[in-house]
Amino acid sequence: MKDSFVVTGGTRLQGAIKVSGAKNSVLKLMSAALLAPGTTMLTNCPEIADVPYMAEVLRGLGCEVELDGDVVRITTPESIEYNADFEAVRQFRASVAVLGPLTSRCHKARVALPGGDAIGSRPLDMHQSGLELLGATTKIEHGCLVAEAEELRGAQIKLDFPSVGATENILTAAVLAEGTTTLDNAAREPEIVDLCNMLVAMGAKIDGAGSNTITVEGVDRLNPVDHEVVGDRIVAGTWAYAAAMTRGDITVGGIDPQHLHLVLEKLKLAGAQVETYPTGFRVVQNERPKAVDYQTLPFPGFPTDLQPMAIALCTVSEGMSVITENIFESRFRFVDEMMRLGADASIDGHHVVIRGREQLSSAPVWSSDIRAGAGLVLAGLVADGKTEVHDVYHIDRGYPEFPEQLRSLGAEVERVQR
Protein backbone atom coordinates (compact mmCIF):
# COMPACT_ATOMS: atom_id res chain seq x y z
CA MET A 1 0.00 0.00 0.00
CA LYS A 2 1.16 3.51 -0.83
CA ASP A 3 0.37 6.80 0.87
CA SER A 4 -1.79 9.41 -0.81
CA PHE A 5 -2.95 12.88 0.20
CA VAL A 6 -6.63 13.80 0.11
CA VAL A 7 -6.92 17.56 -0.37
CA THR A 8 -10.22 19.40 0.08
CA GLY A 9 -10.28 22.64 -1.87
CA GLY A 10 -11.74 26.00 -1.01
CA THR A 11 -9.84 27.11 2.11
CA ARG A 12 -7.92 30.38 2.33
CA LEU A 13 -4.54 29.64 3.91
CA GLN A 14 -3.48 31.97 6.71
CA GLY A 15 -0.79 31.95 9.37
CA ALA A 16 2.95 31.75 9.90
CA ILE A 17 5.38 28.97 9.12
CA LYS A 18 9.14 28.49 9.47
CA VAL A 19 11.09 26.54 6.89
CA SER A 20 13.84 24.14 7.88
CA GLY A 21 17.20 23.64 6.19
CA ALA A 22 17.44 23.15 2.45
CA LYS A 23 17.16 19.67 0.97
CA ASN A 24 19.44 20.79 -1.84
CA SER A 25 22.08 21.78 0.71
CA VAL A 26 21.97 19.28 3.57
CA LEU A 27 22.71 16.24 1.39
CA LYS A 28 25.83 17.91 -0.06
CA LEU A 29 26.96 19.04 3.39
CA MET A 30 26.59 15.48 4.65
CA SER A 31 28.79 14.32 1.76
CA ALA A 32 31.35 17.02 2.52
CA ALA A 33 31.75 15.56 6.02
CA LEU A 34 33.71 12.76 4.31
CA LEU A 35 36.55 15.25 3.81
CA ALA A 36 37.35 15.66 7.52
CA PRO A 37 38.13 12.87 10.00
CA GLY A 38 36.20 13.43 13.21
CA THR A 39 32.64 14.43 14.05
CA THR A 40 30.75 17.00 11.98
CA MET A 41 27.42 18.25 13.33
CA LEU A 42 24.75 19.75 11.07
CA THR A 43 21.81 21.63 12.60
CA ASN A 44 18.55 22.91 11.08
CA CYS A 45 18.38 19.76 8.96
CA PRO A 46 15.06 18.99 7.25
CA GLU A 47 13.37 15.81 8.45
CA ILE A 48 12.82 14.40 4.97
CA ALA A 49 13.25 10.93 3.48
CA ASP A 50 16.46 11.75 1.59
CA VAL A 51 18.42 12.46 4.79
CA PRO A 52 18.20 8.84 6.06
CA TYR A 53 19.02 7.68 2.51
CA MET A 54 22.22 9.74 2.53
CA ALA A 55 22.99 8.51 6.03
CA GLU A 56 22.92 4.95 4.68
CA VAL A 57 25.32 5.90 1.88
CA LEU A 58 27.75 7.39 4.41
CA ARG A 59 27.46 4.40 6.75
CA GLY A 60 28.36 2.17 3.81
CA LEU A 61 31.54 4.23 3.39
CA GLY A 62 32.55 3.67 7.02
CA CYS A 63 31.02 6.67 8.79
CA GLU A 64 28.91 6.64 11.92
CA VAL A 65 25.76 8.72 11.42
CA GLU A 66 23.31 9.77 14.13
CA LEU A 67 19.98 11.36 13.21
CA ASP A 68 18.34 13.29 16.06
CA GLY A 69 15.45 15.45 14.90
CA ASP A 70 16.92 18.37 12.99
CA VAL A 71 20.49 17.45 14.02
CA VAL A 72 22.77 15.12 12.04
CA ARG A 73 26.10 13.98 13.50
CA ILE A 74 28.58 12.32 11.17
CA THR A 75 31.76 10.73 12.50
CA THR A 76 34.22 10.10 9.69
CA PRO A 77 37.15 7.72 10.30
CA GLU A 78 40.73 8.35 9.16
CA SER A 79 40.28 5.64 6.54
CA ILE A 80 37.04 5.44 4.52
CA GLU A 81 35.71 3.14 1.84
CA TYR A 82 35.59 4.35 -1.77
CA ASN A 83 32.77 2.13 -3.06
CA ALA A 84 29.30 3.67 -2.59
CA ASP A 85 26.68 0.96 -2.07
CA PHE A 86 24.36 0.45 -5.05
CA GLU A 87 21.19 -0.16 -3.06
CA ALA A 88 21.61 3.05 -1.07
CA VAL A 89 22.78 5.22 -3.96
CA ARG A 90 20.06 4.22 -6.40
CA GLN A 91 17.39 5.78 -4.17
CA PHE A 92 18.13 9.39 -5.00
CA ARG A 93 20.08 11.69 -7.27
CA ALA A 94 22.05 13.66 -4.67
CA SER A 95 24.06 10.55 -3.76
CA VAL A 96 26.45 11.45 -6.61
CA ALA A 97 27.69 14.24 -4.30
CA VAL A 98 30.03 11.72 -2.63
CA LEU A 99 32.06 11.52 -5.87
CA GLY A 100 34.20 14.60 -5.21
CA PRO A 101 34.94 13.91 -1.54
CA LEU A 102 35.82 10.25 -2.22
CA THR A 103 38.13 11.13 -5.10
CA SER A 104 39.75 13.74 -2.86
CA ARG A 105 40.17 11.56 0.25
CA CYS A 106 40.71 8.11 -1.26
CA HIS A 107 42.06 9.02 -4.70
CA LYS A 108 39.46 6.58 -5.93
CA ALA A 109 35.68 6.55 -6.07
CA ARG A 110 33.14 4.07 -7.31
CA VAL A 111 29.59 5.44 -7.22
CA ALA A 112 26.57 3.64 -8.64
CA LEU A 113 24.69 5.77 -11.14
CA PRO A 114 22.00 7.44 -9.07
CA GLY A 115 18.22 7.40 -9.16
CA GLY A 116 15.88 10.24 -8.17
CA ASP A 117 13.21 12.32 -9.85
CA ALA A 118 12.06 11.64 -13.41
CA ILE A 119 12.37 15.21 -14.68
CA GLY A 120 14.72 14.67 -17.60
CA SER A 121 18.31 13.93 -18.46
CA ARG A 122 20.91 15.04 -15.93
CA PRO A 123 24.19 13.75 -17.40
CA LEU A 124 27.37 13.47 -15.37
CA ASP A 125 29.76 14.50 -18.15
CA MET A 126 30.62 17.84 -16.50
CA HIS A 127 31.36 16.04 -13.23
CA GLN A 128 33.70 13.70 -15.11
CA SER A 129 35.44 16.36 -17.20
CA GLY A 130 36.00 18.52 -14.11
CA LEU A 131 37.63 15.67 -12.20
CA GLU A 132 39.71 14.76 -15.25
CA LEU A 133 41.08 18.30 -15.45
CA LEU A 134 42.10 17.92 -11.79
CA GLY A 135 44.09 14.82 -12.75
CA ALA A 136 41.65 11.94 -12.32
CA THR A 137 40.63 9.34 -14.87
CA THR A 138 36.92 8.52 -15.04
CA LYS A 139 34.76 5.92 -16.71
CA ILE A 140 31.31 4.40 -16.56
CA GLU A 141 31.68 0.71 -15.71
CA HIS A 142 29.02 -1.85 -14.76
CA GLY A 143 26.49 0.84 -13.90
CA CYS A 144 28.95 2.84 -11.80
CA LEU A 145 30.93 6.02 -12.27
CA VAL A 146 34.55 5.24 -11.40
CA ALA A 147 37.20 7.90 -10.75
CA GLU A 148 40.88 7.28 -9.95
CA ALA A 149 43.80 9.64 -9.36
CA GLU A 150 47.33 9.20 -8.05
CA GLU A 151 47.09 12.84 -7.01
CA LEU A 152 44.84 15.79 -7.74
CA ARG A 153 46.30 19.09 -8.93
CA GLY A 154 44.62 22.47 -9.27
CA ALA A 155 43.43 23.45 -12.73
CA GLN A 156 41.59 26.04 -14.79
CA ILE A 157 38.06 24.67 -15.33
CA LYS A 158 35.19 26.25 -17.24
CA LEU A 159 31.77 24.62 -17.11
CA ASP A 160 29.64 24.53 -20.26
CA PHE A 161 26.62 25.19 -18.04
CA PRO A 162 26.51 26.38 -14.40
CA SER A 163 25.62 22.93 -13.09
CA VAL A 164 25.04 22.83 -9.34
CA GLY A 165 26.09 19.20 -8.97
CA ALA A 166 29.23 19.57 -11.08
CA THR A 167 30.22 22.74 -9.20
CA GLU A 168 29.82 20.90 -5.88
CA ASN A 169 31.86 17.85 -6.90
CA ILE A 170 34.65 19.95 -8.39
CA LEU A 171 34.83 22.09 -5.23
CA THR A 172 34.96 19.09 -2.89
CA ALA A 173 37.66 17.48 -5.02
CA ALA A 174 39.71 20.69 -5.33
CA VAL A 175 39.86 21.63 -1.63
CA LEU A 176 42.50 18.97 -0.91
CA ALA A 177 44.21 19.14 -4.32
CA GLU A 178 47.71 20.55 -4.72
CA GLY A 179 47.73 24.09 -6.07
CA THR A 180 45.01 26.49 -7.17
CA THR A 181 41.78 25.66 -9.00
CA THR A 182 39.79 28.32 -10.82
CA LEU A 183 36.22 27.33 -11.70
CA ASP A 184 34.54 29.57 -14.28
CA ASN A 185 30.81 29.61 -15.05
CA ALA A 186 30.26 28.11 -11.61
CA ALA A 187 26.77 27.72 -10.17
CA ARG A 188 25.76 30.67 -7.96
CA GLU A 189 22.93 29.11 -5.96
CA PRO A 190 22.65 29.84 -2.21
CA GLU A 191 23.26 26.15 -1.60
CA ILE A 192 26.69 26.49 -3.27
CA VAL A 193 27.47 29.41 -0.96
CA ASP A 194 26.34 27.30 2.02
CA LEU A 195 28.68 24.47 1.00
CA CYS A 196 31.58 26.90 0.55
CA ASN A 197 30.90 28.48 3.94
CA MET A 198 31.10 25.07 5.59
CA LEU A 199 34.26 24.11 3.68
CA VAL A 200 35.94 27.39 4.68
CA ALA A 201 34.99 26.76 8.31
CA MET A 202 36.64 23.33 7.92
CA GLY A 203 39.85 25.03 6.81
CA ALA A 204 39.46 25.26 3.03
CA LYS A 205 40.64 28.34 1.13
CA ILE A 206 37.84 29.43 -1.20
CA ASP A 207 37.09 32.82 -2.76
CA GLY A 208 34.20 33.91 -4.97
CA ALA A 209 31.35 31.74 -3.71
CA GLY A 210 28.10 33.13 -5.11
CA SER A 211 29.84 34.56 -8.19
CA ASN A 212 30.54 33.09 -11.63
CA THR A 213 34.17 32.40 -10.73
CA ILE A 214 35.26 30.45 -7.67
CA THR A 215 38.93 30.07 -6.73
CA VAL A 216 40.14 27.23 -4.51
CA GLU A 217 43.63 26.96 -3.05
CA GLY A 218 44.21 23.40 -1.94
CA VAL A 219 45.11 22.58 1.66
CA ASP A 220 46.59 19.47 3.28
CA ARG A 221 43.79 18.65 5.70
CA LEU A 222 40.30 19.74 6.74
CA ASN A 223 38.75 19.62 10.20
CA PRO A 224 35.20 18.72 11.29
CA VAL A 225 32.85 21.57 12.21
CA ASP A 226 29.39 22.42 13.49
CA HIS A 227 27.29 24.06 10.77
CA GLU A 228 23.72 25.33 10.43
CA VAL A 229 22.05 24.42 7.13
CA VAL A 230 20.77 27.36 5.08
CA GLY A 231 16.97 27.73 4.87
CA ASP A 232 15.11 25.97 2.06
CA ARG A 233 14.20 28.58 -0.55
CA ILE A 234 12.19 26.09 -2.62
CA VAL A 235 9.95 25.11 0.30
CA ALA A 236 9.65 28.81 1.22
CA GLY A 237 8.69 29.59 -2.37
CA THR A 238 6.09 26.83 -2.29
CA TRP A 239 4.42 28.51 0.70
CA ALA A 240 4.51 31.83 -1.15
CA TYR A 241 2.63 30.27 -4.06
CA ALA A 242 0.19 28.58 -1.69
CA ALA A 243 -0.69 32.03 -0.34
CA ALA A 244 -1.16 33.46 -3.83
CA MET A 245 -3.25 30.52 -5.06
CA THR A 246 -5.66 30.42 -2.14
CA ARG A 247 -5.88 34.23 -1.87
CA GLY A 248 -4.32 33.77 1.52
CA ASP A 249 -1.97 35.48 3.95
CA ILE A 250 1.17 33.55 4.89
CA THR A 251 4.29 34.73 6.72
CA VAL A 252 7.35 32.55 6.06
CA GLY A 253 10.38 32.57 8.39
CA GLY A 254 13.80 30.93 8.38
CA ILE A 255 14.76 32.18 4.92
CA ASP A 256 16.76 35.03 3.40
CA PRO A 257 14.24 36.72 1.05
CA GLN A 258 17.09 37.69 -1.28
CA HIS A 259 17.31 34.00 -2.18
CA LEU A 260 13.80 34.37 -3.66
CA HIS A 261 14.03 37.91 -5.04
CA LEU A 262 12.79 37.11 -8.56
CA VAL A 263 10.12 34.73 -7.25
CA LEU A 264 8.66 37.40 -4.99
CA GLU A 265 8.81 39.96 -7.81
CA LYS A 266 6.79 37.58 -10.02
CA LEU A 267 4.19 37.24 -7.28
CA LYS A 268 3.94 41.02 -7.06
CA LEU A 269 3.22 41.07 -10.81
CA ALA A 270 0.46 38.52 -10.15
CA GLY A 271 -1.13 40.98 -7.73
CA ALA A 272 0.25 39.80 -4.39
CA GLN A 273 1.31 42.15 -1.62
CA VAL A 274 4.80 41.15 -0.49
CA GLU A 275 6.67 42.33 2.60
CA THR A 276 10.24 41.21 3.29
CA TYR A 277 12.16 40.96 6.56
CA PRO A 278 15.78 40.01 7.33
CA THR A 279 14.80 36.36 7.90
CA GLY A 280 11.52 35.96 6.07
CA PHE A 281 8.65 37.45 4.10
CA ARG A 282 4.87 37.78 3.98
CA VAL A 283 2.63 37.18 0.95
CA VAL A 284 -0.98 38.40 0.89
CA GLN A 285 -3.27 37.84 -2.10
CA ASN A 286 -6.74 39.37 -1.93
CA GLU A 287 -7.91 39.27 -5.56
CA ARG A 288 -7.76 36.71 -8.33
CA PRO A 289 -4.12 36.45 -9.49
CA LYS A 290 -3.09 37.99 -12.80
CA ALA A 291 -1.38 35.93 -15.50
CA VAL A 292 2.43 36.15 -15.53
CA ASP A 293 5.00 34.65 -17.92
CA TYR A 294 7.95 32.63 -16.59
CA GLN A 295 11.19 31.16 -17.84
CA THR A 296 13.40 28.98 -15.68
CA LEU A 297 17.10 29.80 -15.45
CA PRO A 298 20.02 29.08 -13.11
CA PHE A 299 20.19 31.29 -10.00
CA PRO A 300 19.52 34.20 -9.75
CA GLY A 301 16.92 33.37 -12.39
CA PHE A 302 13.57 31.72 -11.69
CA PRO A 303 14.23 28.26 -10.19
CA THR A 304 13.13 25.21 -12.14
CA ASP A 305 12.10 23.60 -8.85
CA LEU A 306 9.34 26.22 -8.47
CA GLN A 307 8.09 25.89 -12.03
CA PRO A 308 5.30 23.43 -11.06
CA MET A 309 4.05 25.88 -8.44
CA ALA A 310 4.12 28.71 -10.98
CA ILE A 311 2.12 26.58 -13.42
CA ALA A 312 -0.40 25.74 -10.71
CA LEU A 313 -0.90 29.46 -10.01
CA CYS A 314 -1.24 30.27 -13.71
CA THR A 315 -4.06 27.71 -14.11
CA VAL A 316 -6.31 29.88 -11.92
CA SER A 317 -4.94 33.29 -12.94
CA GLU A 318 -6.76 35.85 -15.06
CA GLY A 319 -5.37 35.77 -18.60
CA MET A 320 -2.85 33.70 -20.57
CA SER A 321 0.61 32.70 -19.35
CA VAL A 322 3.59 31.21 -21.18
CA ILE A 323 6.06 29.17 -19.13
CA THR A 324 9.42 28.26 -20.67
CA GLU A 325 11.50 25.46 -19.14
CA ASN A 326 15.22 25.88 -19.90
CA ILE A 327 16.74 23.40 -17.42
CA PHE A 328 15.00 19.99 -17.58
CA GLU A 329 13.32 18.80 -20.75
CA SER A 330 10.81 16.47 -19.06
CA ARG A 331 9.57 18.78 -16.33
CA PHE A 332 6.24 19.37 -18.11
CA ARG A 333 5.19 15.75 -17.58
CA PHE A 334 3.04 16.81 -14.67
CA VAL A 335 1.02 19.21 -16.87
CA ASP A 336 -1.03 16.20 -18.00
CA GLU A 337 -1.99 15.68 -14.36
CA MET A 338 -2.94 19.36 -14.06
CA MET A 339 -5.21 18.88 -17.07
CA ARG A 340 -7.01 16.12 -15.16
CA LEU A 341 -7.91 18.89 -12.72
CA GLY A 342 -9.34 20.98 -15.54
CA ALA A 343 -6.34 23.15 -16.39
CA ASP A 344 -6.45 24.70 -19.87
CA ALA A 345 -2.88 24.02 -20.94
CA SER A 346 -1.02 23.08 -24.12
CA ILE A 347 2.61 21.99 -24.40
CA ASP A 348 4.89 23.00 -27.27
CA GLY A 349 8.41 21.72 -26.73
CA HIS A 350 10.00 23.72 -23.93
CA HIS A 351 6.94 25.95 -23.56
CA VAL A 352 3.53 25.49 -22.00
CA VAL A 353 0.69 27.92 -22.68
CA ILE A 354 -1.93 28.24 -19.94
CA ARG A 355 -5.25 30.01 -20.03
CA GLY A 356 -6.43 30.58 -16.51
CA ARG A 357 -9.77 29.30 -15.24
CA GLU A 358 -11.86 30.57 -12.35
CA GLN A 359 -11.56 27.20 -10.58
CA LEU A 360 -10.16 23.71 -11.03
CA SER A 361 -12.14 20.50 -10.55
CA SER A 362 -11.11 17.65 -8.26
CA ALA A 363 -9.69 14.42 -9.68
CA PRO A 364 -7.22 11.66 -8.82
CA VAL A 365 -3.70 12.68 -9.87
CA TRP A 366 -0.25 11.11 -9.66
CA SER A 367 2.98 12.72 -8.53
CA SER A 368 6.03 12.04 -10.72
CA ASP A 369 8.62 13.95 -8.67
CA ILE A 370 9.00 16.05 -5.52
CA ARG A 371 8.06 19.43 -6.95
CA ALA A 372 5.34 18.16 -9.29
CA GLY A 373 3.71 16.53 -6.29
CA ALA A 374 3.77 19.78 -4.33
CA GLY A 375 2.31 21.62 -7.31
CA LEU A 376 -0.55 19.13 -7.53
CA VAL A 377 -1.30 19.56 -3.83
CA LEU A 378 -1.45 23.33 -4.32
CA ALA A 379 -3.81 22.82 -7.25
CA GLY A 380 -6.00 20.63 -5.04
CA LEU A 381 -6.30 23.52 -2.60
CA VAL A 382 -8.23 25.52 -5.21
CA ALA A 383 -10.19 22.67 -6.84
CA ASP A 384 -13.80 21.94 -5.97
CA GLY A 385 -14.31 18.83 -3.85
CA LYS A 386 -11.62 16.35 -2.83
CA THR A 387 -8.47 15.77 -4.88
CA GLU A 388 -6.42 12.62 -4.29
CA VAL A 389 -2.69 13.01 -4.92
CA HIS A 390 -1.01 9.61 -5.25
CA ASP A 391 2.66 8.53 -5.01
CA VAL A 392 3.34 11.16 -2.36
CA TYR A 393 6.53 9.40 -1.30
CA HIS A 394 8.09 11.80 -3.80
CA ILE A 395 6.80 14.77 -1.79
CA ASP A 396 8.10 13.24 1.45
CA ARG A 397 11.61 13.39 -0.04
CA GLY A 398 11.53 17.19 -0.07
CA TYR A 399 8.81 18.57 2.21
CA PRO A 400 8.95 17.86 5.97
CA GLU A 401 5.52 17.03 7.41
CA PHE A 402 3.76 18.62 4.44
CA PRO A 403 0.15 17.73 5.40
CA GLU A 404 0.70 18.79 9.00
CA GLN A 405 2.16 22.13 7.95
CA LEU A 406 -0.69 22.72 5.50
CA ARG A 407 -3.22 21.98 8.22
CA SER A 408 -1.49 24.50 10.51
CA LEU A 409 -2.39 27.12 7.89
CA GLY A 410 -6.02 26.01 7.70
CA ALA A 411 -5.93 23.55 4.80
CA GLU A 412 -7.97 20.34 4.81
CA VAL A 413 -5.40 17.67 3.95
CA GLU A 414 -5.06 14.12 5.20
CA ARG A 415 -2.67 11.28 4.52
CA VAL A 416 -4.33 7.98 3.62
CA GLN A 417 -3.14 4.56 2.46
CA ARG A 418 -4.53 3.15 -0.76
From Swiss-Prot:
| Lineage of the organism | Bacteria, Bacillati, Actinomycetota, Actinomycetes, Mycobacteriales
Cell inner membrane is among the record's keywords: no
Report the subcellular localization.
Answer: Cytoplasm
Q: What is its main location?
A: cytoplasm
Positions with a binding annotation for phosphoenolpyruvate: 23-24
The enzyme's E.C. designation: 2.5.1.7
- Give an example GO molecular function: UDP-N-acetylglucosamine 1-carboxyvinyltransferase activity
What chemistry does it catalyse, as a reaction equation? Answer: phosphoenolpyruvate + UDP-N-acetyl-alpha-D-glucosamine = UDP-N-acetyl-3-O-(1-carboxyvinyl)-alpha-D-glucosamine + phosphate
Could you tell me which SUPFAM superfamilies the record lists for this protein? EPT/RTPC-like
Q: Active site located where?
A: 117
Look up the coiled coil feature and give its residue ranges. Answer: none
Quote the pathway field. Answer: Cell wall biogenesis; peptidoglycan biosynthesis
Query: Could you state one GO biological process linked to this protein?
Result: regulation of cell shape
Q: Which function does this protein serve?
A: Cell wall formation. Adds enolpyruvyl to UDP-N-acetylglucosamine.
> What family, per the record?
Belongs to the EPSP synthase family. MurA subfamily.
Q: Where does UDP-N-acetyl-alpha-D-glucosamine bind?
A: 93, 305, 327
Output the Gene Ontology cellular-component terms.
Answer: cytoplasm
- InterPro entries reported in the protein's UniProt record: Enolpyruvate_Tfrase_dom (IPR001986), Enolpyruvate_Tfrase_sf (IPR036968), MurA_subfamily (IPR050068), RNA3'P_cycl/enolpyr_Trfase_a/b (IPR013792), UDP_GlcNAc_COvinyl_MurA (IPR005750)
Which Gene3D superfamilies did the record assign?
Enolpyruvate transferase domain (3.65.10.10)
| Keyword line | Cell cycle, Cell division, Cell shape, Cell wall biogenesis/degradation, Cytoplasm, Peptidoglycan synthesis, Transferase
- The name this protein carries in UniProt is UDP-N-acetylglucosamine 1-carboxyvinyltransferase
Chaperone listed as a keyword: no
Which enzyme class, named as a word?
A: transferase
